[in-house]
Amino acid sequence: MERQVPRVLLNSGHEMPVIGFGTAIDPLPEPEQLVSAILHAIEVGYRHFDTASAYMTEEPVGRAISEAMKRGLIKGREELFVTSKLWCADAHRDLIIPALKETLKRLGLDYLDLYLIHFPVRLKKEAVSLEHEIDDFRFEDHELLPFDIKGTWEAMEECSRLGLTKSIGVSNYGTVKISQLLQHATIPPAVNQVEMNVAWQQKKLREFCSKKGIHVTAWSPLAGIGAFWGSTVVIESKTLKEIAAAKGKSVAQVALRWIQDQGASCIVKSMNKDRMKQNLEIFGWKLSDEDGRKIEQIKQSRLYPAKLFINENSPYPSLEALWDGDL
């Protein structure tokens, strides 16, 4: 049975479902597999789909949307919220609008609901394609260019004015970089999509974004299980296991419910039909204040440092520089 997912009102005036279906999957499934998974996700109630140029999943997402309309699973495009992201090699002022148009072409859509800057990083256009990131991969220093916060955002604003996307935002931005962006913005970011879970709670960043009217979306809400950088720190959490047992819920449901209780939304990934459904069963109940206090005590650690952008001769010679000291 299809479930109704609540929506949050963004500062752009548009509403976004608070759970999205993520497509940053490694290893990359066969296109038909992903199309089938997205169709099932639509059947059980997902209405927000998150992709990116770097994920190489835009075409299957678009095919699934087209097929869903043909099958009558949705009445029209407007029932869905589609997010994609600007890759770093396209983060040049004159390349951003063409990059978004290419994304729309791959998706077979006239507009996005949300377009995000994937990282506050600019690469040379000819930089190596990020097909399969591995732990020791690094971009060469000559591939990493100074990031133009002002010019990049001005082009994102133009994407919005042209009607190519309804909302614009950022991803993996810390407080310093958001502050710098806001000095120049005429349209503020609607969303900051960041690593966030019970083991990396991002309290400082969330409070900052809230004051600025920017909604926070959590990627890796279950700590990236299956990714080379991922961890079982959430799923194997003793604290979450105890809370889950007491409430008759799964650990994953408790972890996702905690994110909702913080006023954030999340992007979940699963090709498993049962888990797809379970990940939507987090509404109609809440964690207690005592549960929240216990979760606050969980040891904190960033799981995905994005070392691929760190080079002593690059704009980000250290992780501290990339993440605004928030490690």
Swiss-Prot record:
Could you tell me the keywords of this UniProt record?
Alkaloid metabolism, NADP, Oxidoreductase
What switches its activity on or off, per the activity regulation note?
Strongly inhibited by Cu(2+) and Zn(2+) and to less than 30% by Co(2+) and Fe(2+).
How does pH influence this protein's activity? Optimum pH is 6.8-9.8.
Q: Which GO terms describe its biological process?
A: ecgonine methyl ester biosynthetic process; ecgonine methyl ester catabolic process; ecgonone methyl ester biosynthetic process; ecgonone methyl ester catabolic process
Catalytic activity line of the entry: ecgonine methyl ester + NADP(+) = ecgonone methyl ester + NADPH + H(+)
The residues that the entry says bind substrate are: H118
Q: What class of enzyme is it?
A: oxidoreductase
Provide the free-text tissue specificity comment from this protein's UniProt record: Expressed in young leaves. Detected in stems and flowers, but not in mature leaves or roots. Expressed in the palisade and spongy mesophyll tissue of leaves and sepals.
Q: Does the keyword Phosphoprotein apply?
A: no
Q: Where is the active site?
A: Y55
Q: Name one GO molecular function term.
A: oxidoreductase activity, acting on the CH-OH group of donors, NAD or NADP as acceptor
Alphabetized CDD domains for the sequence: AKR_AKR4A_4B (cd19124)
Q: Where does NADP(+) bind?
A: 220-279
Q: Mind telling me which InterPro entries this protein's record contains?
A: AKR, AKR4A/B, Aldo/ket_reductase_CS, NADP_OxRdtase_dom, NADP_OxRdtase_dom_sf
Matching Pfam families: Aldo_ket_red
Tell me which EC number(s) this protein carries. Answer: 1.1.1.334
Q: Which family does it belong to?
A: Belongs to the aldo/keto reductase family.
Task performed by this protein: Catalyzes the stereospecific reduction of methylecgonone to methylecgonine, the penultimate step in cocaine biosynthesis. Can also use 6-hydroxytropinone, tropinone and nortropinone as substrates, but not 8-thiabicyclo[3.2.1]octan-3-one (TBON), cyclohexanone, cyclooctanone or N-methyl-4-piperidone. NADH can substitute for NADPH, but with a decreased activity.
**Protein known as:** Methylecgonone reductase
The organism is Erythroxylum coca
